[in-house]
Design a protein with these regions (language model features):
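N-terminal maturation segment of proteins
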Residues: 1-161
Length: 161
């Protein structure tokens, strides 16, 4: 769904640069944000399994970000990363070890959470700046009109929105 919505927005982006260049952190962050937004907006509210699934995956994704940072800048070992996955998520044994190993060769696998957190920060800022004029539709339209921007340029959505 995130690729469909983002893909549709990309086809209508106002410039060729915005239609062609893509930020994986934005795309994956948008997907993670949309999952959480579904819970916030009450999707499947009568079935707690949906929310539990979203939160379980969020734990895996935030642990990926922590391990990626740990392995690449704080001297975390693969064994320590696997232990972190076992302590903080539902993963254990080979699954936890596989996730920890991934941090050694894919330093961007934390981009899901990073992108989501930046979008949520932007949402809070838009709410603050736009006041009573804030709506999710307005924010999402302004954001998707940028195409698939690098995270550092998402703030222009507030100015243009």
């Amino acid at each position: 769904m995130n690729f469909q919505l983002n893909g549709r927005a990309l086809r209508h982006a106002p410039t060729p640069v915005r239609r062609i260049l893509h930020s994986s952190a934005f795309i994956e962050g948008w997907a993670h944000y949309a999952e959480e937004l579904c819970v916030e907006e009450g999707f499947a509210a009568g079935d707690p399994r949906f929310a539990v699934g979203v939160w379980l995956e969020a734990l895996v994704r935030i642990t990926r970000l922590a391990c990626s940072i740990g392995v690449h800048s704080a001297g975390m070992t693969v064994s320590e990363g696997a232990a972190r996955f076992e302590a903080d998520t539902h993963l254990s044994g080979p699954a936890a070890l596989s996730e920890a190993r991934r941090a050694t060769f894919d330093p961007t696998y934390g981009r899901y959470t990073w992108g989501k957190l930046e979008i949520m920060k932007l949402r809070d800022e838009a709410r603050r700046q736009w006041g009573a004029g804030f709506t999710l539709n307005r924010l999402h339209a302004a954001l998707l009109n940028l195409g698939s921007p690098p995270l550092g340029l998402m703030g222009t959505a507030i100015v243009r929105g």
